[in-house]
Amino acid sequence: MLRTHTCGELRATDEGKKVKLCGWVDRIRDLGGVRFIDLRDRYGETQIVCDVNSEAYSVVDELTRESVVLVEGTVRKRPEGTENPNIETGEIEVVAERIEILSLADPLPFYPGETPKEEMRLKYRYIDLRSERMKRNIILRYRISKIIRDYFDELGFLEIETPFLTRSTPEGARDFLVPSRLRPGKFYALPQSPQLFKQILMISGFDRYFQIVRCFRDEDLRADRQPEFTQVDVEMSFVDVEDVLNVSEGMVSRVFKESSGIDLKVPFDRIPYDDAMEKYGTDKPDRRYGMELRDFGYAFETTEFKVIRNVLNEGGSVKGFIVPGFASEMSRKKGEELMARMKELGLGGLIWFKLDGGITSPHLKHLEKEFRKIAETENMNEGDVCLIAAHTDRNLLNEALGTLRLEIGKEHFSHLAKGFDVLWVVDFPYFEWSEEEERFVARHHPFTMPVLETLGDDYTKVRAKAYDLVINGYEVGGGSIRIHRRDIQEKIFELLGLSEEEAQKKFGFFLEAFRYGVPPHGGIAFGLDRLVSIIAGESSIREVIAFPKTGNGVCLLTGAPAEVDERQLRELRIRIEEG
């Protein structure tokens, strides 16, 4: 080994020891007769002292920041009053006898700890990863992964690898396709999840499986998504919903406790999907901001205000929420901004009033009676604001108000966004309407067990034995009890519009396995990137991934995706069409 110790290891008890340290030159200070180097590695930082009479003193002339050096010297206590309590090695320094330059650094485009634009950070990721922030995040990710592995090992789970090169089963996002050179015209697909393989492992008798696994989705990237991501994949046999939730809560609570000393309240709260949509306008609620959505229909039963009267006559709804202490912010201009936002979200507009020395509103002339009833029924206080909207589509109304609620919360009540709001959303609808495909599709995936009492030809009434884990408004995990009977699986395919021939073509190998003894089973998958980012206090998962892609799916470090050699394309019998 070139070094005897790391840069975060030496203490006052090591005084007098001869040591060798290796690391990066963080800073250089020249005080005339003595020069100081702050030497850094991933373990910490040590102050190096170069006296004017030492061989090391002149070598400092050649050094640049971020050069890599080997230092030989002797540990001594720092003079009294010069200790640095901000670093672990702050009681000592190393008096250098020799410095060897291992690698001289050119001027860097930026230095560790600086925060240039994200594009620059991603292009020179090897520099960015030297920063304390990124080092802390990457080490936290490793520790969380280890905690997860230890937890499942203690419970008798086996970590079993599943294939990366598999077949395309296009249900949901697009697959990344990999052409086969040996089988021209045929393609592998990179897995969006190990879903079918982990179910086959249950059929194979491996009743407790987990895997920390890379997954791939070729989708139009929304904010803070990655084309490749890591999930903690879990599957168990002979279980029902309660068993999966209990094991999951044990894992998540241990991760928070052992990685960061955070105690979560167990069991986690549970909210039915319908309640989440009615109260928060989303199936990923963040309850820290309060401001639950309310049905204000009671105040408008006899209203003559034309816009709302027309909506109610068509069977529509009037809903809204109270924003506490928001009156000073709620000017006419702010009201116009919020109204414009609601129109962007698909509604006709927004009605509002505030309690500011009485009821104030641009709509007061037409709706004073209704406003007074809301203020009284909802126990509004001086300074509160009430936002109201109406629409014939209750789902659209909930979603629009839910979006507005969250935006107001993040912009004006960020001080409430502390701690961790952890909950399960349960009792999901099995199907949802896809505007793009103009048909009903499985909300989770088509291997989810339906609640059999709800299974029929009315898509809107079928419920799924599915569950999502939500932390601070982010979906961190999702899973379900799986179908283990072939007749039920075939019924789901039928409801999805998959003919027997199509089902055999896409999932024949899987359906074949159903003939040979399938245990009841279920599982869940957690997004490791998101879980780590929440614990780390980072708003973007890119901050907890060593080498992430941009929002456009580009690796700025390597330039991927890139063109390939024409010869490679010919071997694969692929021709690129322009346009």
From Swiss-Prot:
The UniProt entry's GO biological process terms, in alphabetical order, are: aspartyl-tRNA aminoacylation
GO CC terms on record? cytoplasm
Question: EC number(s) of the enzyme?
Answer: 6.1.1.23
Instruction: Report the top EC class in one word.
Output: ligase
Question: Which InterPro entries does UniProt cross-reference here?
Answer: Aa-tRNA-synt_II (IPR004364), aa-tRNA-synth_II (IPR006195), aa-tRNA-synth_II/BPL/LPL (IPR045864), Asp-tRNA-ligase_1 (IPR004524), Asp-tRNA-ligase_1_N (IPR047089), Asp/Asn-tRNA-synth_IIb (IPR002312), AspRS_core (IPR047090), GAD-like_sf (IPR004115)
User: PROSITE patterns annotated for this entry?
Assistant: AA_TRNA_LIGASE_II (PS50862)
Principal place of residence = cytoplasm
**Reactions mediated catalytically:** tRNA(Asx) + L-aspartate + ATP = L-aspartyl-tRNA(Asx) + AMP + diphosphate
What is the annotated localization of this protein?
Answer: Cytoplasm
What keywords is this UniProt entry annotated with? Aminoacyl-tRNA synthetase, ATP-binding, Cytoplasm, Ligase, Nucleotide-binding, Protein biosynthesis
Top-rank taxon: Bacteria
Q: Where does L-aspartate bind?
A: E171, R217, H444, R482
* HAMAP family, per the entry: Asp_tRNA_synth_type1
What this protein is reported to do is described as: Aspartyl-tRNA synthetase with relaxed tRNA specificity since it is able to aspartylate not only its cognate tRNA(Asp) but also tRNA(Asn). Reaction proceeds in two steps: L-aspartate is first activated by ATP to form Asp-AMP and then transferred to the acceptor end of tRNA(Asp/Asn).
- Subunit annotation: Homodimer.
Protein name (Swiss-Prot/TrEMBL): Aspartate--tRNA(Asp/Asn) ligase
Give the species this sequence originates from. Answer: Thermotoga maritima (strain ATCC 43589 / DSM 3109 / JCM 10099 / NBRC 100826 / MSB8)
Taxonomic lineage from the root: Bacteria, Thermotogati, Thermotogota, Thermotogae, Thermotogales
- Gene, per the UniProt record: aspS
